[in-house]
A protein has these predicted regions:
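HDAC/HDAC-like amidohydrolase catalytic core signature
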Residues: 1-155, 159-164
């Protein structure tokens, strides 16, 4: 069975005035619920702060969590205007990506996070609708926590930015 990590905050964690197409998560969930595909939806755990720090500058992470990013940093990320759910949304997305990786490694073989792929964030800044880089966090955590994982290959085929 295909495991898909999903949380409603993926949609409502983005302000309804944002130009980001936030409805795509709930619409995808609805379409999959109505399909014949055997999908198990799993609600992710919120990521621990220590797991974010393994791939991002602590000063940047703390500024985001404490709501002290400057307007220039927020504009570079996008998703504006931000609402009061953006921090939890971000942490649930990262938790969903980690959950999918752990599921694949430990048993299932196939899993995904509906809002994962936030790979345009850099070490000390966000970019392109990505606050933190879930791909980097997952790769670093997998190599740290699973001794049989020594190498990870990430291929970014995005057309739009090429900075993943």
């Amino acid at each position: 069975m295909f495991e898909l990590f999903y949380h409603p905050i993926y949609t409502y964690g983005i302000d309804e005035r944002s130009r980001f197409p936030r409805e795509r998560y709930q619409l995808t969930k609805k379409a999959l619920d109505e399909s014949r595909h055997k999908i198990q939806f799993i609600e992710p755990q919120i990521i621990e702060m220590e797991d974010i720090y393994i791939a991002h500058d602590k000063t940047y992470v703390d500024a985001f969590i404490n709501g002290t990013l400057c307007e220039k940093q927020k504009r570079k990320i996008g998703l504006q205007p931000w609402n009061d759910q953006i921090i939890d949304r971000t942490r649930y997305i990262l938790g969903g990506s980690l959950g999918a990786v752990e599921s694949v490694i430990n048993s299932n073989g196939i899993s995904a996070n509906m809002a994962g792929g936030t790979h345009h964030a850099h070490y000390s800044e966000g970019s392109g609708y990505c606050i933190f880089n879930d791909i980097a966090i997952c790769a670093k955590k997998a190599m740290r926590d699973y001794e049989h994982i020594n190498n990870i290959l990430i291929i970014d085929l995005d057309v739009h930015q090429g900075n993943g």
